[in-house]
């Protein structure tokens, strides 16, 4: 990062600006420290990979001396931003409160809220329920609603799609007004002059910019980040099982998180390095050269996975998952893995539940590595069956208590690359 580089220059070379209001005016404003915000509705107990770019954007701005505000949508989260299909489930205040506590902890991995830290502009966390709950219906209609054209609101893509299908409730239809009012409140209270968000938030962001102009005569700004997809054009952040990739390690293990990024396609890995990491322009250019010249080494993917796991889960978790990956291929000792890391690594494969008297043939079949005992017998005879990285040559072999990892686990392998796991219980 150049000492003379403006944050907007940084975002531009990284390709992080999708849409924005007057970009030159924003660049001029960011010559001095500004306050910006991004909102996160606590509709779940964890943020997910789809939140990564806005989260990391807040961190980038803070590194350049600007003050980030993270807005927890305690009020808007009870309503829900309209989505393309169907109404959202309504959450209780208690659920929202519990989710906010969990999400605050995740936000701390990205921005520094500490007043006495070395950061010039410590982040602030606010809850829009604190001001929205104080507003009565008359104030809402008079001070907010009168500034919005129904024609403009109906023209929003999501609203149009909902009206053409199953309709939309007035509750969700009002979301845009409440979010716009958040921006007015934050401008008045914190002199906030920039809102950032995902591309799907552009309509809401522009509404807030316009409401500030109408109510305060203020010139504020808005910026959205690019839509992130995988190499096949699918929505970014879906795990191999099809579910979301969560920041909470109890929902998505650090091993699964690491594996998602190390499996990034060559066509997207450089974009991911620009968007998600804090590597310099020169470092990324060097990795881009290696992708072009030696893609089989997958060095860019390894760097990406390491950077992203360290950012979200910490350096110790990164070391553990890299050790697990090495151990599965016999390049490190399986006995050195703690049980949670071993278990999460094996959850990426089939895990068989077997009795203590299971033979190698039982293990190969029950784990799905072979379809029949006849095929399993051939694999053993050809020297292709491994348990805990040890070749098994006896078709009658059963594990001893000493061979069980953490008292119950076995790592099975057929050939060089096909893995499975087994949990051994009492004899059947």
Swiss-Prot record:
Residue numbers covered by motif 'KMSKS' region: 235-239
UniProt keyword terms in alphabetical order: Aminoacyl-tRNA synthetase, ATP-binding, Cytoplasm, Ligase, Nucleotide-binding, Protein biosynthesis, RNA-binding
Enzyme Commission number, as recorded: 6.1.1.1
Substrates-to-products reaction catalysed: tRNA(Tyr) + L-tyrosine + ATP = L-tyrosyl-tRNA(Tyr) + AMP + diphosphate + H(+)
Motif range ('HIGH' region): 42-51
Database matches in SUPFAM superfamilies: Alpha-L RNA-binding motif, Nucleotidylyl transferase
Principal location class: cytoplasm
GO CC annotation, single: cytosol
Annotated GO biological process: tyrosyl-tRNA aminoacylation
Residues annotated for ATP binding in this entry: 238
Amino-acid positions noted as binding L-tyrosine in the UniProt annotation, renumbered to this chain: 37, 175, 179
Compartmental location: Cytoplasm
One Pfam assignment: SYY_C-terminal
InterPro entries: aa-tRNA-synth_Ic (IPR002305), Rossmann-like_a/b/a_fold (IPR014729), S4_RNA-bd_sf (IPR036986), SYY-like_C (IPR054608), Tyr-tRNA-ligase (IPR002307), Tyr-tRNA-ligase_bac-type (IPR024088), Tyr-tRNA-ligase_bac_1 (IPR024107)
Record-annotated S4 RNA-binding domain positions: 358-415
GO molecular function: ATP binding; RNA binding; tyrosine-tRNA ligase activity
Role this protein plays: Catalyzes the attachment of tyrosine to tRNA(Tyr) in a two-step reaction: tyrosine is first activated by ATP to form Tyr-AMP and then transferred to the acceptor end of tRNA(Tyr).
Family statement drawn from the similarity comment of this UniProt entry: Belongs to the class-I aminoacyl-tRNA synthetase family. TyrS type 1 subfamily.
PANTHER family, A to Z: TYROSINE--TRNA LIGASE, MITOCHONDRIAL (PTHR11766:SF0), TYROSYL-TRNA SYNTHETASE (PTHR11766)
Quaternary context: Homodimer.
Protein known as: Tyrosine--tRNA ligase
